[in-house]
Amino acid sequence: MSQNIRVVITGMGALSPIGNDVKTTWENALKGVNGIDKITRIDTEPYSVHLAGELKNFNIEDHIDKKEARRMDRFTQYAIVAAREAVKDAQLDINENTADRIGVWIGSGIGGMETFEIAHKQLMDKGPRRVSPFFVPMLIPDMATGQVSIDLGAKGPNGATVTACATGTNSIGEAFKIVQRGDADAMITGGTEAPITHMAIAGFSASRALSTNDDIETACRPFQEGRDGFVMGEGAGILVIESLESAQARGANIYAEIVGYGTTGDAYHITAPAPEGEGGSRAMQAAMDDAGIEPKDVQYLNAHGTSTPVGDLNEVKAIKNTFGEAAKHLKVSSTKSMTGHLLGATGGIEAIFSALSIKDSKVAPTIHAVTPDPECDLDIVPNEAQDLDITYAMSNSLGFGGHNAVLVFKKFEA
């Protein structure tokens, strides 16, 4: 167990397929709102995939100057909007006296895919001189962190983690450790992604990762029979985390405490999880060891649960192997059933869900739960939110490349 500085969550910001802020996103999650619909951003006629979780009624020019927005890929735009909400929510004052002790650590799994597509077309059609000088700064995944730090003036530890679908959770975990060891007083952290593009849809389709089901009510159905892949989503989930001393000194509202972080590698396959979910199991155990708790102490687990045939089953096996008899009493829901899979942003959104579950004593459901897979026989909180007094919550993220990341959150007690 870490005997270091206590770290708490004091601010949250979200853009998701079920809401353009934290309040709306959480309310809709508890209502079981389905954010998945037909893709509008691109013409999907040539593709086998036609559904995604897109943002609704969102205009970037309501948040960022048009000229500046044109110099950022969507994933960076989303990060700035969510980070501003989180900092405002935390009432965090970033000024010349505090800036050096406030850092930014925001990840993106694939970075500026739309920017790449546009630049490639310019190169092929008109030659190298027509490629924008902003191409590289718009493309690279670390630019969400860079632009957020510039926008907010945060000059502390600054970096970006890229671990595919585990990116958001790894980012929060690394930021947690930065604060825990005293290298910063506060960190703005999470994940962001804008993957609804021609190349991303084509690429993930080619790897057979995406659902080809055109029924919005059954395309994303984690832990159910007949599931055939994940549904892409977009957005950003950003937290302000800080030392308990800093939070208490300024009278900040505290949502929950972060007490554990575990991360492992499968060393098995570029896309498939290790047999029996072995790597994920080790990450869950590492996170509990870091928190100094046992399986029986955890009441809720926000699962990775992407709705892939192999992934869901392996995660269930990993949970059973890790929790043993305690798995029978554990609430396990996949909020991706509502949002779709936001890739690098998903860990940020699901950290928000986990913390708010603790704060509000409510667990968001796994919707579309109508044909349970008998091998995925956990309590997945089917279709309707449940009231639950939670002391400890866990959030899992598992990514291509064998990346496994797990966070443990605790109800705050002074």
Swiss-Prot record:
Statement: the UniProt record of this protein carries the keyword Lipid metabolism: yes
Pfam family, one: ketoacyl-synt
This enzyme's EC code(s): 2.3.1.179
Cysteine-cysteine disulfides: none
An annotated Gene Ontology molecular function: 3-oxoacyl-[acyl-carrier-protein] synthase activity
Domain of life: Bacteria
Listed InterPro entries: 3-oxoacyl-ACP_synth-2, Beta-ketoacyl_synthase, Ketoacyl_synth_AS, Ketoacyl_synth_C, Ketoacyl_synth_N, PKS_Beta-ketoAc_synthase_dom, Thiolase-like
CDD domains, sorted: KAS_I_II (cd00834)
Recorded GO CC terms: cytosol
Function summary: Involved in the type II fatty acid elongation cycle. Catalyzes the elongation of a wide range of acyl-ACP by the addition of two carbons from malonyl-ACP to an acyl acceptor. Can efficiently catalyze the conversion of palmitoleoyl-ACP (cis-hexadec-9-enoyl-ACP) to cis-vaccenoyl-ACP (cis-octadec-11-enoyl-ACP), an essential step in the thermal regulation of fatty acid composition.
PANTHER family for the chain: 3-OXOACYL-[ACYL-CARRIER-PROTEIN] SYNTHASE, MITOCHONDRIAL, POLYKETIDE SYNTHASE-RELATED
The protein's name: 3-oxoacyl-[acyl-carrier-protein] synthase 2
Annotated organism of origin: Staphylococcus aureus (strain MRSA252)
